[in-house]
């Protein structure tokens, strides 16, 4: 009778051949090492009586393939997921009377095709394990090997899963497995989205939990140090300087305690509100910029009294952290917001949610820390007689090798390293002084020179060098002073050239706008408190990126938490979102140009006064 075709003859035969050699090695203890290939090829056969005779005498002919599968002994035919009777009887004959193998599992009529196959595979595994123990010095002979109950019905061998799958045939199990894989593909995608959503909620929970901890830390400063100092008084040498130590941290604490923390907790019920929460309070977060601007002065005062007066207060209050460790918390927190928002955005996008507003929120929280860092650098600038806050927003700062003009307007023979600050109204050249406080971590700067934007000129790519450019200053008598700047990176130089060119272009636009003041006022009203021009952001109508000069629509409010400052045409009434304590909606129907309304928040009366913080308090 012709044996049935095998599903995958090449790969299956190779695996079966190796498996047969392993079984043959188990049945013949005298054979060690890998079997030798038969020179006669796979067609040579050996009778069963010859095999038994060789086992008894211990002799074998070298030209006979000892491990080759034999048609009458243990050849395996796979068809419809079952083993043939000849294969089962061959296994029974292979075990022999002295091997101790029971003939029941390998009887010509097995209990079931899969059960018989599993027992056959288990016998192979058991033989190999016993052989390993014998080689390691333990006693035991091959004749005494028995098939113990190591495999129960329904249990599979993990090491032999691939082989079991190949031997089950193409009938009832192969095709359903493929169909199951195809049917599980969308299910796995849904599970991945569900898992990503769970991770995003975990990040949101971490944001809320760390916000509570942050509020407690600020409370130790306001309700601990500041309250105690107000009750007991301060030393004479510290009187009048205690406000420099704490800055506006009380305003930050009250806003987080009475409003922001409660809003974050509501986001646990509605995660989509998280992005709007940060976008809405972009202007309120300007408190951190003011705090960071005062931070270098606070460090200077704290360095004089930190080891004496404030240490006594810490021990009196029983606080674990020192005051300078608590005062750095707002700086760390404003950086933490952007990291948590980025993680939330990553998982929320994987969950298939709309992340357009989240991307805007991340951009806001990347811009605010940059402004904070700039203000901390400016707080360490000494020797400038003017008021830095009157010079407009800080557009950039970098270190250059500057060749400055000397007496007579001639350039110096060598360049000097300078820290250059670019404002809207002035460019300041300063020299780094090294460590700026205790520990020398932050450098201080001393003022050297400056150029007013009204007298500024630009020469880019000097001598074809992309790292070099020149800034010129027109003197009161018509003379020109020239500063040659060389950056370490061409990208830095080109960014400065572009930024200065935009400033000069804006200056020309301003002169042209003098002929039309109303149009100029409309354009300037698109700038919010952080100095970020309004306009379309990428993927977001009504907002723009920092430094973008595109003019925004006059109908688009910049910040929903504040009244609109835009000039509207006569007769047009637009609904304006007021601060939370005075929010009122107009009865006039909303025009197509109005911005979408933000979710209504029930604000307790204790929170209302925080919404009245004006520009001077910030």
Swiss-Prot record:
Cysteine pairs forming cystine bridges in this chain are: none
Q: What does the record say about tissue specificity? A: Highly expressed in excitable tissues, such as brain, heart and muscle. Elevated expression in hippocampus and cerebellum.
Region described as Important for binding to Rho GTPases = 317-338
Recorded GO terms, molecular function?
guanyl-nucleotide exchange factor activity
Q: What is its main location?
A: cytoplasm
Region called Disordered, residue ranges: 26-63, 169-193, 521-556, 584-604
Record keywords: Cell membrane included? Answer: yes
* SUPFAM superfamilies, A to Z: DBL homology domain (DH-domain) (SSF48065), PH domain-like (SSF50729)
User: Where does the record say this protein resides?
Assistant: Cytoplasm, Myofibril, Sarcomere; Cell membrane; Cytoplasm, Myofibril
Provide ranges: composition bias, Polar residues: 584-593
Q: Name one Pfam family in it.
A: RhoGEF
Q: Which GO terms describe its cellular component?
A: myofibril; plasma membrane; sarcomere
Which residue ranges does the record assign to the PH domain? 387-505
The protein's superkingdom reads Eukaryota
Chain residue ranges for the region called Sufficient to bind activated GNAQ? 506-532
Q: Which keywords fit this entry according to its UniProt record?
A: Cell membrane, Cytoplasm, Guanine-nucleotide releasing factor, Membrane
Gene3D superfamilies in UniProt: Dbl homology (DH) domain (1.20.900.10), Pleckstrin-homology domain (PH domain)/Phosphotyrosine-binding domain (PTB) (2.30.29.30)
Q: What induces it?
A: Transcriptionally up-regulated during myogenic differentiation and down-regulated during adipogenic differentiation. Protein levels up-regulated during retinoic acid and dibutyric cAMP-induced outgrowth of neurites.
Q: Does the keyword Flavoprotein apply?
A: no
For this protein, the record's InterPro entries field holds: DBL_dom_sf, DH_dom, PH-like_dom_sf, PH_domain, RhoGEF_Guanine_NuclExch_SF, SOS1_NGEF_PH
Q: What transmembrane ranges does the database entry give? A: none
Q: How does it assemble?
A: Interacts with activated GNAQ and GNA11. Interacts (via the DH domain) with POPDC1 (via the C-terminus cytoplasmic tail). Interacts with RHOA, CDC42 and RAC1.
**Domain remark from Swiss-Prot or TrEMBL:** The guanine nucleotide exchange activity is autoinhibited by the PH domain.
The name this protein carries in UniProt is Rho guanine nucleotide exchange factor 25
Originating species? Mus musculus (Mouse)
Q: What is the lineage of its organism?
A: Eukaryota, Metazoa, Chordata, Craniata, Vertebrata
